[in-house]
């Protein structure tokens, strides 16, 4: 993995709001992404991340990519100066990334889940859990449907808190309906290619017609051979 600064993933202390409960409006496109709603494509299929995984080609690709990332060796480096780096033997972050990101998942399960979110829905999100010192001690994957990304200026945080206008904040809605706002330093976010600098483009949205056609063809073939 890429080299990291002296304090890997350390939280910034200046001008950063603590994780706080929030409320606010969202566009229809936000809710559409939030709940995974899929519009019917020309084949008549409704393509969502769940329905796309019923298409054998999609399932095979997601499984292959997730397995490759999950089996890749993980090393943590500390950056020395501007051009040198040093392998961080025994750094606690290495165990988080390599062995157990959280108490509910092995690293294999975590990375397969993270990659599936990224390739299907366009974004992989994981909340970074920290000790009081700011050191990262855990990673929890978040369903992209439950995450909305904002620039600081969109929420008025640049005026209220004095943070950079283009700093990212993540509104996460949990199963109990509560929503919390997280600073970009408390979120691991790997997006697909995108257009706004905040979120990656959903593969399902971009390739919906092709996936829908594949689903329809498989269903048609299955009905033919069942008769």
Predicted regions and their residues:
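Structured, contiguous alpha/beta core segments that scaffold functional sites
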Residues: 2-227
